[in-house]
Amino acid sequence: MDFVHDQLATGRKIRVLTIVDTFSRFSPAVDPRFSYRGEDVVLTLERICKTVGYPRTIRVDQGSEFISRDLDILAYQKGVVLDFSRPGKPTDNSFIESFNGKFRSKCLNTHWFLSLDDARQKMEDWRRDYNEVRPHSAIGNKAPISL
């Protein structure tokens, strides 16, 4: 998990929580909001894990939303290990950084977001294409949904 920053056409800043499975490259969520706290990360995880289940491990950086008490409690309750990357070492979480680069170049840089709802819809459309249509060389030129 990681965050990407962008803005609406009005200039109002948004933060997007990006989540990717390192094995299948499947992205269960890209979730834009005006602000994020630890409890917001937990709400997003609980929503998506109802569908895809809880992972064994979640790799995150040292951001305040990820070192929060809320996320720590959820991880403890669900038996999930939080694997923190070393401060200042984005290569420790290279899968999500690669995903974020594709997300920025193919979605964020190609759209104007007129509202948060507009951003949510355009990002969801991109995420579905990424998961269901786009072949990934790292997984044998298959779409992540096929794994």
Listing of model-derived features with the role each one plays in the protein:
Residues 1-147:
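Charged DNA-binding/catalytic regions of mobile-element recombinases
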